[in-house]
Amino acid sequence: MQSSVLQSIGKTPILKLKLSKDLPGTVWLKLENQNPGGSIKDRVAFHCLERAVKRGELRDRMVAATSGNLGIGCALVCAAWGLECFLTMPESMSDERKALLRGFGAQLRLTPAAAGMGGAVEEAKRLA
């Protein structure tokens, strides 16, 4: 049994796939969608935030712009560590994505869709 959801990051199943009897070789699949946040970006978020904490660059809150999976990974890690997570994103992102981020405890600041990710990045810089 794991004591933290973070311990399951990266410990995803590996499947052996034989594409066809006519094709030699084997394809191996690592099912990164089985990470707790649903993507390989959980690994990136964990290692980046862990490094920032070890360097003393991150103490109690993080601010970042996101369009999705990396933000979900960051929100997951922050929730597990008790850090505040402020994310900026274009208002055009799906309601499901916004709900998932909020479910992990992230505070969202939505930026105008017309400004795209550039607008979200500028807002994150302003908040940081």
Q: What kind of region is each of these model predictions?
A:
Residues 1-128:
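PLP-dependent amino-acid enzyme catalytic core
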